[in-house]
Amino acid sequence: LLDQPGQDAWLHVVGTTLTDGGGGGTDRERDIDRLVEAARKVLEGGEPATAGRSGHETVEAEIVVQAAEVVCRLADRYPRDPALLLVPMLQRLVLQPGEAMFVGPGVLHAYLGGMALEVMTPCDNVVRGGFTSKHVDTRALVDLLDTGNIPGVQRPVEGVHCYEVPVEDFAVWRIEGRHTLQVRT
């Protein structure tokens, strides 16, 4: 199903992962336990990760280790969150200082750590899929999910730089220089 995930496949996976289908969540809880157990095993060295591998296999193994680290970290904070089951399917990006990305509406994402500036248009439509104590609206998430919009990373440019955003609602400028800049309002 996920070898070539299209819009319908992703919507199905997200929808069925985040809802219990009326079964009381027993199967989902078992799946979460299995995922966390497997992730811990990878991190403890019980499953081969990068040893004895080279090239493409090593890169894939490193991705598995990174996903296992994220699963374990999130499972410690949100032990029964169904969104844990989605972690291995998500792309992990690490932004360096000055880098930016535009995450459009409907793109499933999570901030795992660090400092970031998030700019949104004025709205009241944040839809959460998990990893929160706030309300999770799975139906709205599935209805709004956009799986075709993969954001690209914009690299920093010295001096004055306006980050590219495909909307007219706002702009984000980065100003770097040797002098102090005072802004009066």
Q: Which sequence ranges carry the predicted segments?
A:
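C-terminal, non-catalytic macromolecule-binding modules
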Residues: 114-162
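Residues that cap or initiate secondary-structure elements
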Residues: 109, 125, 179-181
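A broad, low-specificity signal marking well-ordered, structured residues that form hydrophobic/aromatic
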Residues: 101, 117, 173
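Short, solvent-exposed helix-helix connector turns and helix-capping sites enriched
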Residues: 9, 80-81, 137
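A short glycine-rich, His/Asp/Glu-containing loop-to-beta-strand
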Residues: 154-184
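Long, charge-rich alpha-helical interaction segments
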Residues: 1-74
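Conserved metal-binding segment of the jelly-roll/cupin
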Residues: 94-113
